[in-house]
Amino acid sequence: MRLILLSGLLLLGTFLANGDEKDSEIQLLNSMIEAVMILQRDFSNLRYALMTVHNARSFGSGSERVYVSNKEVSKFEGLEEICSQAGGHIPSPQLENQNKAFADVLERHNKAAYLVVGDSANFTNWAAGHPNEADGTCVKADTHGSWHSASCDDNLLVVCEFYFIL
């Protein structure tokens, strides 16, 4: 944006130095300069709003991950598409505070939701007797954040995980 502004000013200076003061060209340059200044202001406002939301959402959890539900339910098979269309992923808490933030969403809705547990997970929160493939090959978290083996065909609360890396 600054390059556009500087180019416009350079062009304006060239017109003035050549004595070529065409009103329409000067008005066009002034309009461009004004438009760039408005864009810079709008960008600053948008960045401030985004940072405010980010800080508010991550304040309570201390996490750069945010867990959000659309209040719908889905089987595991459709969950990745739902989350990816929203710009997120299936939840995969890697730390206790992330699992707590995820569980807070489940508690508010009083429903369980699917999550993904990686093979190299440093953090797990399995309930007693789990994992147990007899219950299913998917994983769900209950309203307390405990993980249970589950059928992938259960309709559970849609919760997606979003990363804030700024």
UniProtKB/Swiss-Prot annotation:
- Which residues are tagged as glycosylated in the record? N122
**Superkingdom field:** Eukaryota
Transmembrane ranges? none
A Gene Ontology term for the protein's cellular component: extracellular region
Q: Which residues form the signal peptide?
A: 1-19
Q: Keywords, A to Z?
A: Disulfide bond, Glycoprotein, Lectin, Phospholipase A2 inhibitor, Secreted, Signal
Task: Give the disulfide map.
Answer: C83-C160, C138-C152
InterPro entries registered for this protein in UniProt? C-type_lectin-like, C-type_lectin-like/link_sf, C-type_lectin_CS, CTDL_fold
Pfam families, per the entry: Lectin_C (PF00059)
> What molecular function does GO assign, one term?
carbohydrate binding
Q: Identify the PROSITE patterns for this entry.
A: C_TYPE_LECTIN_1, C_TYPE_LECTIN_2
Q: Modified after translation how?
A: N-glycosylated. The glycosidic chain may contain superficial sialic acid residues.
Question: Which subcellular locations apply to this protein?
Answer: Secreted
Query: Member of which family?
Result: Belongs to the alpha-type phospholipase A2 inhibitor family.
> What protein does this entry describe?
Phospholipase A2 inhibitor CgMIP-II
Q: Which organism is it from?
A: Cerrophidion godmani (Porthidium godmani)
Task: Provide the organism lineage as a comma list.
Answer: Eukaryota, Metazoa, Chordata, Craniata, Vertebrata
